[in-house]
Design a protein with these regions (language model features):
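Loop-helix junctions at membrane interfaces
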Residues: 1-236
């Protein structure tokens, strides 16, 4: 089963696409993190660690990246598998319900901060080129962020009223895992590693990351929960 997660992650990494969005050319959509999250929700910590290391190493080999791998990105892969595993193993149902409320509050706060950040900037540097962030673009981003929140909350309410207790626990874990990884790895660790390696300012890529998170959080929750439910049925 661990090998299946490694293969899926590598395939999805190779299928990453750069999507032009609102005139910006570098919104990279990639789903390789999702099999690692599902692995974390399915396997034990030791196996999750092996899956993450194997995925990172084989990804470098297939990409023909020479030299020693940067351990910061290896840590990213490990966290993407281990965070869901730790949530699964150490959270009681009572704590999950509390953390679900915390996730909603955090999403609201992050969305507001994202809107404030987008509102303050007038131009952004992407791949060495400067792009103007006009008022219509800002308004469109605000609408997208609001739509993402509405979709996420509707999705949570719909499934909470529909699922059995066992499936509801899996659903809670999917939400917590996707949001936790998006905040820790995508929004914090990755820009920090890029700053350490290439001198890219920490906040230089946050504009694009905010846009990406608006897409990836709802999409990630849906895919992770669906994949996990299918795997649980096969295992049983």
């Amino acid at each position: 089963l661990g090998a299946l997660f490694v293969i899926l992650a590598i395939i999805l990494k190779r299928l990453a696409v750069m999507v032009p969005f609102l005139g910006f050319p570098s919104l990279k959509i990639t789903l390789e993190v999702l099999p690692l999250i599902v692995a974390g929700l399915t396997l034990q910590p030791g196996y999750c660690f092996i899956v993450a290391i194997a995925t990172d190493f084989l990804g470098l080999v297939l990409a023909n990246a020479g030299g020693f791998p940067f351990l910061g990105f290896t840590l990213n892969a490990v966290l993407q598998a281990e965070i869901p595993c730790l949530l699964k193993n150490y959270l009681s149902e009572k704590n999950e319900k509390l953390l679900e409320r915390i996730v909603k509050i955090v999403m609201l706060v992050i969305s507001l901060l994202g809107c404030l950040y987008v509102f303050k900037i007038n131009e952004v540097n992407i791949s060495g080129s400067m792009y103007q962030v006009t008022l219509p673009i800002k308004f469109t981003i605000f609408v997208i962020i609001a739509a993402m929140l509405v979709i996420l909350f509707i999705f949570i309410k719909y499934y909470k009223n529909k699922l059995r207790q066992e499936d509801l626990r899996l659903f809670h874990l999917s939400i917590l895992s996707v949001v936790a990884i998006e905040l820790t790895v995508t929004m914090f660790l990755t820009p920090y590693w890029l700053q350490s390696m290439y001198g890219i300012p920490f906040f230089a890529s946050q504009f694009v990351r905010i846009l990406k998170s608006c897409v990836m959080i709802p999409l990630g929750i849906i895919i992770v929960y669906t994949m996990n439910r299918m795997i649980q049925k096969v295992i049983k």
